[in-house]
Design a protein with these regions (language model features):
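Acidic, metal-coordinating catalytic segment for phosphate/diphosphate chemistry
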Residues: 1-26, 103
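N-terminal strand-loop-strand
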Residues: 15-55
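Active-site segment of metal-dependent pyrophosphate-handling enzymes
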Residues: 21-23, 40, 70-73, 77-126, ...
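Active-site-proximal cofactor/substrate-binding loop regions of enzyme domains
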Residues: 49, 56-77
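NUDIX/MutT-family hydrolases
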Residues: 115-119, 126-161, 174-182, 204-206, ...
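Short helix-coil junctions and helix-kink-helix linkers
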Residues: 187-196
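Charge-enriched amphipathic alpha-helical scaffolds
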Residues: 195-213
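Long, intrinsically disordered, low-complexity Ser/Thr/Pro-rich regulatory/activation regions
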Residues: 214-248
Length: 248
């Protein structure tokens, strides 16, 4: 039977042992397909233990001398080829025993995941998969059970993406350099749902922000009158960067 002093001694010993962390980066890479109103996330099938043959988020251990962001970009570049993207650090996940390779009986090696989320356009992203692993796009509403705690990381990233769209201009990081207002609206509709705002109110609010430049060029894309092409004005946005904004 353990006495109070024995328990206190064990707790004291554990406090003296520092965890040896291996730091990894896991990417939640979203792609938006406005043509068919779909949002995908990139998954890879694991070919090694633990969780062999399970789907997981693309990830890597951070190399010596490599920054976290560099590791995130490296992982992304190994999986897809894309010109325009948005990438942001998401959150750190480091609960004990989140990885089965940790020893459950002592404070030994721990696995810390610093997660990032990225947004790309589906039609602009090409899977290149330089490894032997299977990589595929999965619709966000049809995700299989993921390895480790990647379900938790994915849900966190999905919520961050939806919130971020409402107060920051991340959509313009993934759109072409010149775009119509309807293309912006369709991107928002695809991610936030068609009922988030009607087009006229969205258009009015976006133009009032004063961060778009009319190029003076009109294009015909589908039925209806030719639409104006706009560009994102990064200089006009600078004074607004730290102010609360609502894009919808």
């Amino acid at each position: 039977m353990k006495t109070k002093s024995t328990i206190e001694q064990n707790d004291s010993n554990k406090k003296e042992i520092l965890a040896d962390f291996k730091v990894g980066v896991d990417n939640v890479i979203f792609s938006v397909d406005t043509a068919y109103n779909r949002v995908f996330v990139l998954l890879r099938k694991r070919k090694e233990e633990p969780f062999v043959n399970w789907w997981s988020l693309p990830g890597t251990l951070v190399r010596q001398g490599e920054t976290l962001t560099d590791a995130a970009y490296r992982t992304l570049a190994e999986k897809i080829q894309v010109d325009n993207l948005y990438l942001e650090q998401l959150y750190s996940f480091g609960d004990p025993h989140r990885d089965p390779r940790e020893n459950p009986d002592c404070f030994g090696v721990r696995y810390l995941s610093v997660s990032y989320f990225a947004l790309v356009r589906y039609e602009a992203a090409k899977i290149i998969d330089k490894s032997n692993y299977s990589v595929s796009w999965y619709k966000v509403d049809d995700i299989p059970k993921l390895a480790f705690d990647h379900d938790k990381i994915l849900n966190y990233g999905w919520n961050r993406l939806k919130n971020k769209l409402q107060y920051s201009p991340i959509a313009f990081d993934v759109l072409p350099a010149e775009f119509t207002l309807n293309e912006v609206y369709q991107l928002y509709c695809t991610i936030l749902g068609e009922n988030f705002s009607d087009y006229s109110n969205f258009r009015s609010r976006l133009l009032k922000l004063g961060i778009l430049l009319d190029t003076g060029v009109k294009v015909s894309r589908g039925a209806g009158r030719p639409a104006s092409l706009y560009k994102f004005d990064a200089e006009a946005f600078k004074p607004l960067k730290d102010k609360p904004l609502l894009f919808i």
